[in-house]
């Protein structure tokens, strides 16, 4: 790498790091960290262990932002000093070291950009992702199961615990619906851009004539609320039905009525949980899902975006799609919002979604 190229890169990095400083408001960040540390030093801090742990997590997250910024800024200053020295006197060994440092700095900046893009109120929370195939029968239901596998692999590769909350088998293959829970910091922040209709074009393995089919499947994503957010749900407003639950792929979880379906009468929202072995456990999980949907609905009303963000896709068809997955006559996955695309469709279906997720977060800033 020539010195002129390194200089241009460092100038661009300096602009980005300066932008980070302005967006972070370092003085305010330092004050917030100091306030949290003061809370943690109080003798009664551990009286409520759950609340204490949340304060610790918040403090650690803010410190990480601050420390990462300082590390990048220090690396930039060191690189700029080395560049000045090399412009005065050539040194191959130092130039090789500077090149490595410049590459490493670029990688740090890219990671930091992603971190600060997760700045929405619920980005840090766990996520519940629901998959609902559209019309199209077995082909659409099989497409739903392919998406379930894709998201599960992505979650596991990124260290999230992935749980099945509810699973309804397809008529012949695939699934009629599934609800997945992603447990880990920033799960909702990473996944929120996946909400929408996903379109598949392929030669259907279920068509003896080997014709090309187009299928649509809806994906919905919502944050899983923690105890700091209270949602009051009146018992009189909720209808509970129980039924025998079956596991993914036809596995029988329990022969008694352990599955729970909750209907919120005022809004018509329906949620269900089937994967716990007890009715009590499924009711708790279904109620948590219902509260998340109701809270999201209320926030959306305040923003006058009920139809878009309620959690129900208006129409599983061409007009509302966010991404196309074309297997035939060529191979291409393209996000219709950001324009990001790749021909590596097998990798995408194996869970390599980072390019799409990162592009959405930047597009949505």
Swiss-Prot record:
PTM description: Methylated by PrmC. Methylation increases the termination efficiency of RF2.
UniProt xrefs under InterPro entries: PCRF, Pep_chain_release_fac_I, Pep_chain_release_fac_I_sf, PrfB
Gene Ontology MF: a single term: translation release factor activity, codon specific
Family annotation (PROSITE patterns): RF_PROK_I
Keywords, sorted A to Z: Cytoplasm, Methylation, Protein biosynthesis
Gene Ontology, cellular component aspect: cytoplasm
Residue list for modification N5-methylglutamine: 251
Top-level taxon in the UniProt lineage: Bacteria
Pfam families, sorted: PCRF (PF03462), RF-1 (PF00472)
Localization (cell): Cytoplasm
SUPFAM superfamilies: Release factor
Purpose: Peptide chain release factor 2 directs the termination of translation in response to the peptide chain termination codons UGA and UAA.
Family: Belongs to the prokaryotic/mitochondrial release factor family.
Protein name: Peptide chain release factor 2
Gene it is expressed from: prfB
